[in-house]
Amino acid sequence: MARQFSLEKTRNIGIIAHIDAGKTTTTERILFHTGKIHKIGETHDGASQMDWMEQEQERGITITSAATTAFWKNHRINIIDTPGHVDFTVEVSRSLRVLDGAVTVIDAQAGVEPQTETVWRQASEYKVPRVIFVNKMDKVGADFAYAIETLKQRLGVHASAIQWPIGSENDFNGIIDLVEMNAFEYDNTSQETGKVVSIPSDLESITQTKRKELIETLSTLDEELMIYYLEEKPISSEMLKNSIRKATLQASFFPVLCGSSFKNKGVVKMLDAVVDYLPAPCDVAAIVGFDSDNQEIVRTGLDEEPFTALAFKVMTDPYVGKLTFFRIYSGSVKAGSYVTNTTKGTKERFGRLLQMHANSREEVKEAYTGDILAVVGLKATTTGDTLASEGQTIILESMNFPEPVIEIAVEPKTKADQDKMGIALAKLAEEDPTFKVFSNHETGQTIIAGMGELHLDIIIERLKREFKVQANVTEPQVAYRETITQETETEGKFIRQSGGRGQYGHVWMRFEPNPGKGFEFVNKIVGGVVPREYVPAVQKGIQEALAGGILAGYQIIDVKATLFDGSYHDVDSSEIAFKIAASMALKETKTKGNPVILEPIMDVEVVTPNDYVGNVIGDLTSRRGRLENQESRTNAVAIRAFVPLSEMFGYATVLRSNTQGRATFIMQFAKYEKAPKSITEEIIKKRA
């Protein structure tokens, strides 16, 4: 099957935003206006096409990223709708890794919110060009100018309006195009019909001002435009459009549009902006990978190059089994062909190739550069793995995911549940890199860990609904961590000789704090005092010992371990002996490395009416919260603080009580910090 759309006519975009900004509603309107669906489903009715999971429909939120494809003005647009809730940021992160552009949706009344900042930061890490859609212009308190100001103040970006609203709240009924210098008035039908009209006379002055501001902002980024502007030459709409596209592709400028997805106003104009300003796969930089010798390999994104793709998501489909979602960066692949998983060094066979629409699917025979599809039949591939044509060794940069911060113990209710639970949890962990399953060695309990209470609630619900596993759960526990704060050198020596062949392993290790960089192992052995074949065993021994902790049994993080000396025995040395010796060396850091317990700190934002500001601040302070700032919003105050997770259990109920149910809050993991001495002593005592 030949390619249907050229690379230039392809767009891979994501819809990203804070929860309740209207992402899924916006995606539904895109699908409706592009003819992908013929009846609009509403999120609040549980009828959204993209929110296909039962839990999504019941809760009215997006939990998993859903992929679909739409067509607009002879362009193919692959769309991924992502969650806005902080517990599911992994879905945003892995989607952005494979997308070329994004539409950031913000609420016209609230402006930039905490999760907007998080998804914006994630998109910036991957250098994803974005257009910004200020949604809910029909909402009480909607303020387009305020929303743009929050973009500049809170995100610190070059963002300018390329549209201006005609009216707001109930009177929002049109959009002025600052590029074409015309206006579009809507009638109130679901078709987003309307007509091009001249700019209303009472808005002519502000239109000229805002167009001038747009040109001034762009001229600082575009030398040709600056010359025209300084010489007061007329700037055509075509020239302005080209300048916007160029700056947007460089992610140095972000055009701002407005509308109301729910009322079908502005979505078609936003689709035009996706085609006009967001990149095609051939507009983005060449993809760089490395071979097994760490030599750089470049793929420029052509169908003629060898097949190279990245697996970014794994999920279990009740009808076809394991589905692996992947993005093709070069070359093409046919259903039934064999490829290499270069990350794991294994051979995989591509079964059926599927073009997804939420949870429905359409089979295709061949896929090309720039395509985002799902494949059936991959056995060993997991999120972040590189797939390449046979004989290729390229490995693309993988993805990093945050560590879980909250844990609960799960116990199967019956023997039948016990048999099914292990398989079910393994499948769920394979799908979600921020969900972890492990056993408590002391109690024998199965522990599941995730990014928040909602995250784990959804996991338990999926166990029941999808896998028919009934389980009892304990109260949530904080996922504390341990680390060392002082560099130290320790010796680990393991000798067992009781007749016959013995065991001999001997290492000298240097352990150093490694803040924010995780575990790092360095081999500094010279002269073969520890033979090369035993070095991996030393590393493995340390990694296994890190998982068990040295103070209270919590995982040790952010440590650099250097093997610099040791000895061996020609006959008695073995891998197991060196593993044990390495773990003994790590345990010595309990007395020499000044170990501490780390607790997860949450970034909390509470939005409350003015009357309750004192109550909210007093309560946050009593929870060991550190106030960062407070900011006036429309008829409310936003209070931001860093608070230990251990102090936030049950906070929703207390906040409701303190504010008569009129305040809202959101929290997300910020960092790990050293726990106070009293908390540390209490934790160690409990774990003793």
From Swiss-Prot:
Pfam families (UniProt xref):
EF-G_D2 (PF22042), EFG_C (PF00679), EFG_III (PF14492), EFG_IV (PF03764), GTP_EFTU (PF00009)
Tell me where on the tree of life, at the top rank, the source sits.
Bacteria
GO terms classed as biological process:
ribosome disassembly
Q: Would I find Nucleotide-binding among this entry's keywords?
A: yes
GO MF entries: GTP binding; GTPase activity; translation elongation factor activity
Q: Does the keyword Lyase apply?
A: no
Checking SUPFAM superfamilies in the record gives: EF-G C-terminal domain-like, P-loop containing nucleoside triphosphate hydrolases, Ribosomal protein S5 domain 2-like, Translation proteins
* Cellular component, GO annotation: cytoplasm
Residues of the tr-type G domain:
8-282
Q: Which UniProt keywords apply?
A: Cytoplasm, Elongation factor, GTP-binding, Nucleotide-binding, Protein biosynthesis
Annotated positions binding GTP: 17-24, 81-85, 135-138
Q: What is its main location?
A: cytoplasm
Q: Which InterPro entries match?
A: EF-G-like_DII, EFG_II, EFG_III, EFG_III/V, EFG_IV, EFG_V, EFG_V-like, G_TR_CS
UniProt-annotated location(s): Cytoplasm
Q: What CDD domains does this protein's entry cite?
A: EF-G, EFG_III, EFG_mtEFG1_IV, EFG_mtEFG_C, EFG_mtEFG_II
Known role: Catalyzes the GTP-dependent ribosomal translocation step during translation elongation. During this step, the ribosome changes from the pre-translocational (PRE) to the post-translocational (POST) state as the newly formed A-site-bound peptidyl-tRNA and P-site-bound deacylated tRNA move to the P and E sites, respectively. Catalyzes the coordinated movement of the two tRNA molecules, the mRNA and conformational changes in the ribosome.
What family classification does the UniProt entry report for this protein?
Belongs to the TRAFAC class translation factor GTPase superfamily. Classic translation factor GTPase family. EF-G/EF-2 subfamily.
Q: What is this protein called?
A: Elongation factor G
Q: Which organism is it from?
A: Aster yellows witches'-broom phytoplasma (strain AYWB)
Q: Tell me what gene encodes this.
A: fusA
